A protein has these predicted regions:
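FIC/Doc superfamily catalytic core
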Residues: 1-400, 412, 429-436, 440, ...
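Acidic, low-complexity, intrinsically disordered interaction modules
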Residues: 404-422
Length: 444
C-alpha cells in the first residue's frame, strides 16, 4: 500500500487545480492492475464472511446487523466530531428492528432521527435514490436547523459557497473549494443518474467512486460526509443484494481520520486519476471485514453458550452481567468488577458468582487463588482435545489465537489484549481461552 500512496501523492501534489474545474471531471480513471490484488482480497473476505453468516439463524443475523449499524452510526458521526451515546444508539436500533433482550436506554430525538436515516437507507437499498430522499436525510441530521450553534440550510442543496478549511481564525488553511452553488443542482442530477444506473463496475470501486464524487460536490451546507458513507454503503448492499449489513467502513475511517482527509484532498486536487483513493478505500474496507469477522465470532460463541445454558434459572442481573462479558467487555470477572458493573454490593456480587459456579456457568481461573477470577464455561467438555498447534501471536498491534481444529481447519481469532496478557502470565488457562473464542466451531 505504501508505495502506491507515496507515488500518487507526488503526482497529485503537483497540481493546485480542484478536480471539478477540469472538463468532464467525473470521468474518473484508475489503474486496474494496481487495484487487482486488494479487490480480490476484499472479495475473498466478503465471501468468507457471508459463508459464516449462513450458519446464523434470523434472530442472530438481526443482532449482528444491529451491532454493525450501531457502530456505523456512532463512528460516522464521530468522524465529524459528533459523539453519540452508544447505548442510546443500540437501544434505538434494537427497538426499530424489534430485537428483544437489549438494555433499554431512552434515546434522544436526535439519535432516533439519525438511526431512522440509516435504517431507511438499509431497507431501501434497492430503491431509486432521489433528490427528495437525500434532502430529507440531510434534514434529519439537523432537526433544529443548527449545526455547532450556527443556523444552516437544511433539507435543500446549499446556496452558498463551500470552503473546506482548518486552522484558527486568521491562519486558516483552505483544503478544498466545492463547486459553486449554481452548479450543485446539475452536478447532483448527474450523480443521481449515475448512482441509479446499472453500470458494470466492480462494486467496491463503484462504492468508492460514489463516496468521493458526493463529497467533492459537497451539495449540502453540512452532513455531506455522513451521507457519503451511507451512499457508499448502499451500493455495497445493492451488490450483495441484501439489506442485512454486517460490516461498515466508518469505524475504520474514524481510526485513520487524518489519512482519510489527506487522501481525499489529494484526489480533489488531482486530474481525475483516483487510484490512490480507491486503493485506500478498498484496503480500509478489507480491515472492516476483519472487524466484522470478530463480531460474528462473538455472536456465534454467545449463541453457543446460551444454547447450553438456556434452561439454567438465572436472575436478570446475572443474565445482564453474563451478556456483558459474552459481548466482549474487557475485564476479569471478579466480585469487585461484578459489583461495580452491576451496581450492587460486593456481598451480592459474591453470591451471584458463587451461584453461577454451583450451576457450572462460571469456573475459577486458578482454584484457591487469594483474589479469585472466573471464566465463563461455554462448553462443559474440554475442547482443547480438538485443537493442535495452538499459538498466540501479535500482528499490527492486535493479538490472535491461531490453531488447527480437528486436524484440518485453520483457525485465527483476534483476542482481547487483557486475555493475551493473562494467558502469558499463566492466569488464564488454554481451555478457557479456546472456549471463549472458538466455541462456535462446536455448533452442529
Amino acid at each position: 500500500m505504501s508505495q502506491i500512496l507515496r507515488r500518487y501523492s507526488l503526482l497529485n501534489d503537483a497540481s493546485a487545480m480542484y478536480i471539478h474545474e477540469n472538463d468532464n471531471w467525473t470521468a474518473f480513471r484508475w489503474n486496474a492492475t494496481e487495484l487487482m490484488a486488494i479487490l480480490e482480497e476484499v472479495n475473498r473476505k466478503q465471501g468468507l464472511l457471508y459463508g459464516r453468516l449462513a450458519s446464523l439463524g434470523f434472530d442472530s443475523k438481526l443482532k449482528a446487523m444491529a451491532e454493525n449499524l450501531t457502530y456505523e452510526v456512532v463512528y460516522s458521526s464521530e468522524i465529524e466530531g459528533i459523539r453519540l451515546n452508544v447505548d442510546e444508539v443500540r437501544s434505538s436500533i434494537a427497538r426499530k428492528l424489534g430485537i428483544e433482550n437489549v438494555k433499554q436506554t431512552a434515546p434522544s430525538h436526535y439519535i432516533d432521527s439519525v438511526v431512522a436515516v440509516m435504517l431507511d437507507a438499509v431497507n431501501d437499498y434497492d430503491q431509486l435514490l432521489t433528490k427528495e430522499k437525500i434532502c430529507a436525510w440531510q434534514a434529519a441530521f439537523f432537526p433544529t436547523g443548527f449545526s455547532e450553534g450556527s443556523q444552516i440550510e437544511v433539507g435543500q442543496y446549499r446556496t452558498n459557497e463551500e470552503h473546506i478549511i482548518s486552522g484558527i481564525f486568521g491562519r486558516e488553511k483552505i483544503h478544498y473549494i466545492a463547486p459553486s452553488p449554481e452548479r450543485v443542482d446539475e452536478e447532483m442530477a448527474h450523480f443521481l443518474n449515475w448512482f441509479n444506473s446499472q453500470e458494470n463496475i466492480n462494486s467496491v470501486i463503484r462504492s468508492a467512486i460514489a463516496h468521493f464524487w458526493f463529497v467533492s460536490i459537497h451539495p449540502f451546507e453540512d452532513g455531506n460526509g455522513r451521507l457519503a458513507r451511507i451512499l457508499s454503503d448502499m451500493l455495497l448492499a445493492r451488490a450483495d443484494k441484501s439489506k442485512f449489513r454486517f460490516y461498515n467502513i466508518s469505524s475504520q475511517i474514524n481510526k485513520d481520520k487524518n489519512h482519510y482527509y489527506d487522501i481525499l484532498e489529494r484526489a480533489q486536487h488531482g486530474d481525475g486519476d483516483i487510484t490512490e483513493w480507491i486503493y485506500w478505500y478498498a484496503n480500509t474496507l478489507s480491515v472492516a471485514l476483519d472487524e466484522a469477522e470478530n463480531i460474528v465470532s462473538t455472536i456465534l460463541n454467545k449463541s453457543f453458550f446460551w444454547q447450553k445454558a438456556s434452561s439454567v434459572p438465572l436472575s436478570q442481573r446475572q443474565t445482564d452481567m453474563l451478556n456483558l462479558f459474552l459481548d466482549g467487555y474487557e475485564a476479569k470477572i471478579t466480585s469487585k468488577t461484578w459489583a461495580s458493573l452491576a451496581k450492587c454490593s460486593k456481598d451480592t456480587a459474591i453470591r451471584d458468582i458463587q451461584d453461577l459456579v454451583d450451576k457450572d456457568i462460571l469456573r475459577e481461573d486458578i482454584p484457591g487463588a487469594k483474589r479469585p477470577s472466573y471464566s465463563i464455561i461455554y462448553d462443559p467438555e474440554d475442547i482443547t482435545v480438538f485443537f493442535s498447534d495452538v499459538t498466540i501471536e501479535q500482528q499490527n498491534g492486535n493479538h490472535y489465537i491461531k490453531a488447527l481444529y480437528k486436524g484440518r481447519l485453520k483457525v485465527c481469532e483476534r483476542i482481547l489484549p487483557l486475555d493475551a496478557e493473562r494467558f502469558e502470565k499463566g492466569d488464564l488457562q488454554l481451555e478457557n481461552l479456546l472456549a471463549k473464542y472458538c466455541s462456535y466451531l462446536r455448533i452442529s
